[in-house]
Curated annotation (Swiss-Prot):
Major localization listed first in the record, in broad terms: cytoplasm
Record localization: Cytoplasm
PANTHER family: EUKARYOTIC TRANSLATION INITIATION FACTOR 4 GAMMA (PTHR23253), EUKARYOTIC TRANSLATION INITIATION FACTOR 4 GAMMA 2 (PTHR23253:SF9)
Family indicated by similarity: Belongs to the eukaryotic initiation factor 4G family.
Domain MIF4G per the UniProt entry, residue ranges: 175-414
Protein name, UniProt field: Probable eukaryotic translation initiation factor 4 gamma homolog
GO molecular function: mRNA binding; translation initiation factor activity
Biased amino acid composition, Basic and acidic residues: 96-118
The protein's assembly and partners: Component of the eIF4F complex, which composition varies with external and internal environmental conditions.
UniProt keyword terms in alphabetical order: Cytoplasm, Initiation factor, Protein biosynthesis, RNA-binding, Translation regulation
UniProt keyword Nucleus, yes or no: no
Described function: Component of the protein complex eIF4F, which is involved in the recognition of the mRNA cap, ATP-dependent unwinding of 5'-terminal secondary structure and recruitment of mRNA to the ribosome.
Positions of region (Disordered): 59-118
Length: 610
């Protein structure tokens, strides 16, 4: 069949051919055509319903069954139907007539069913009449009530249930999280802790600082969440320590900002939880040796609960060792001072059981190198000698841990001393031509510098007054080790030359002046010598004249030195050097009295105008 798509008056430009014989259009040449035969579903004829009524809908009675249809005499309607069938004219096509007659015979055979006998039909009808009689229907229907009976029924009485519910008394000061709220500060902080990785730690810190924490109890709950995650996730413990390093001073709740608190609740709660975990001793060791002391019944009960005991043992051990990991990470980042680590070491050395020894070895392995570098070799020597004496009384596993710790100790080396004057080794000829080695005699201050460096590091992480009070013994140890005048001369030289620790060292001396053994005459000698060294110090440390002026100003404001000595210690450019600290004190309500002890208010007002 050809169809013309585009027609022109003269000739057709495009001609498309379409074969109607293909049922599904053209196919791939390599694939034979698939013939699909669609057969219509067989028509389901409805079954004839058995009715016990006449054609007009009236019910059949017993007398109706004894009619002429059951006799051999045919009715007129049946005779007429038979004659109509006989008088059907034959069609011309005999084949079609034959097929139709066969189909009619099949249908007639299928429709004809054997009729039951007359007695059976009468019996069936009697059974149906008995089954569906009015009495039977009334019995099956159940009890019947009249309208008056229904209206006279009283309402159902309510049964009171007295339930005794015991409610827990809420303790004061304990945070109860609201589970219905998903946008609370605690849930937001937990979400940020879960996001923490090595790559997005800066983003997590930024998001945590943006969270508004209302009360102190909420901040304590957040600190507890961070502590639990830090000790249970050893892979991320160093990242949690970095979080604490960045948030320990700045992150405060709204309630904290209204109070004058030196240490944040967030950092204080973390320290409390860490130290309490070590102080509250938890035993997790194997109870194999303890079973020898048990009776037979106790031993059988222990064997039944062995699996639960093993799980609990693992949780306790992992919690304690996780706390040591977190504590070591905080100390390595200088988040906490040596004072806290010394307290932990002393707590662990009080008892000699295997659990304590294991925790102590684990702690020294993590922080031992830093202790040696910071000049705490005597602590390592004390711990290692104590463990070496008692190692034979422990099991093989603990003994191996002690030997491993002793082997690692040999690889820990102290920090090298700072390079001194490069030209100290040069030889200088005197007037007589004899060579003199200027560096033959070492300055006593070179031995004090490592001690002062260690002290300044510990002061930088001592946030509480108790920590600084423990460090006050360093002044007495420095006096006895190096001498009073050499020690304090080096101490004040470091205070005015190192701007990073200048305020720490000067404030520390003023706070614990009473614990030192230096007299007023010795202090006067040290400060006058320090004033004479300013010309030499300012060559290498240009900031030393300004820091010297601030130092004597602080000493006079705290009444450590007298007014005559203060006037003697002043330099020619003191007024210009001390202007910054005087103005800072004068603008502060808390320190204004300090400024007025140095200058009168009129002089300070003149400085402000200038």
């Amino acid at each position: 069949m050809i169809k013309k798509i585009i027609h022109r008056p003269k000739r057709s430009l495009f001609v498309f051919k379409k074969e109607e014989s293909l049922l599904y259009g053209p196919r791939v040449k390599s694939a034979p055509p698939i013939e699909i035969s669609f057969e219509p579903p067989a028509k389901i004829e409805p079954k004839l319903a058995v009715r016990f009524t006449r054609a007009d809908g009236t019910p059949i009675r017993k007398e109706d069954l004894l009619d002429s249809t059951d006799s051999e005499i045919l009715s007129e309607s049946s005779v007429e139907s038979e004659t109509e069938v006989e008088n059907i004219p034959q069609e011309a096509d005999t084949g079609n007539t034959r097929e139709e007659s066969e189909e009619c015979q099949r249908e007639a055979g299928a429709e004809e069913e054997p009729r039951p006998a007359l007695e059976d039909r009468a019996l069936m009808l009697d059974n149906l009449l008995k089954r569906f009689s009015e009495q039977k229907i009334a019995e099956n229907r159940g009890p019947c009530y009249s309208v008056d009976e229904i209206l006279s029924v009283e309402d159902r009485k309510a049964i009171s249930l007295e339930l005794k519910i015991k409610t827990r008394k809420e303790a004061k000061g304990v945070y109860r999280p609201d589970n219905n709220r998903k946008d609370t500060c605690i849930e937001q902080a937990r979400l940020e802790f879960n996001r923490l990785t090595a790559k997005n730690i800066g983003l997590v810190i930024k998001n945590l600082k943006a969270i508004r924490v209302g009360t102190i109890e909420e901040m304590k709950e957040i600190a507890k969440i961070l502590f639990d995650k830090a000790i249970s996730e050893p892979t991320f413990v160093k990242y949690y320590a970095l979080l604490v390093l960045d948030l320990k001073k700045e992150w405060q709740s709204e309630e904290e900002k209204t109070r004058d608190i030196t240490q944040t609740v967030f950092f204080g709660t973390l320290l409390t939880l860490t130290l309490k975990t070590l102080e509250n001793k938890e035993r997790w060791g194997d109870e194999y040796e303890r079973r020898k002391e048990m009776s037979f019944e106790e031993r059988m009960a222990y064997e039944e609960k062995l699996e639960e005991a093993e799980t609990e043992r693992y949780i306790k051990k992992r919690r304690t060792l996780g706390t040591i990991d977190f504590l070591s990470s905080l100390y390595s980042l200088n988040v906490i001072s040596y004072v806290h680590m010394n307290a932990c070491i002393n707590t662990l050395m009080k008892l000699d059981d295997s659990e304590n020894v294991e925790v102590l070895c684990y702690l020294i392995e993590n922080i031992g190198e830093k202790l040696v570098v910071s000049g705490k070799e005597h602590i390592i020597s004390m711990v290692c000698s104590s463990l070496a004496q008692k190692k034979n009384s422990y099991t093989n596993r603990i003994r191996y841990m002690i030997e491993s710790l002793l082997d690692k100790r040999s690889s820990w080396k102290p920090r090298e001393a700072k390079a001194g004057n490069v030209f100290s080794c040069l030889e200088v000829e005197n007037d007589y031509g004899n060579a003199q080695n200027q560096g033959s005699q070492e300055s006593p201050s070179e031995d004090v510098l490592p001690f002062l460096s260690s002290l300044s590091e510990e002061l930088s992480v001592a946030y509480e007054d108790d920590d600084k009070e423990l460090l006050s013994d360093s002044l007495q140890s420095g006096e006895s080790k190096f001498g009073v005048i050499p020690f304090y001369l080096s101490y004040f030289q470091e205070a005015i030359s190192n701007h990073k620790v200048s305020d720490l060292l000067s404030d520390f001396f003023i706070s614990f002046r009473s614990t030192s053994s230096i007299t007023e005459e010795q202090l006067r000698e040290v400060l006058l010598s320090l004033k004479g060294d300013l010309d030499v110090l300012k060559i290498d440390f240009p900031i030393s004249p300004k820091k010297y002026s601030e130092l004597i100003t602080k000493l006079r404001a705290s009444k450590v030195i007298s007014q005559p000595l203060f006037e003697e210690l002043k330099t020619s450019d003191y007024n210009s050097r001390a202007t910054d600290i005087i103005l800072r004190w004068y603008k502060s309500d808390r320190d204004r009295e300090k400024a007025l002890t140095i200058f009168p208010s009129e002089a300070i007002e003149n400085l402000i105008r200038k």
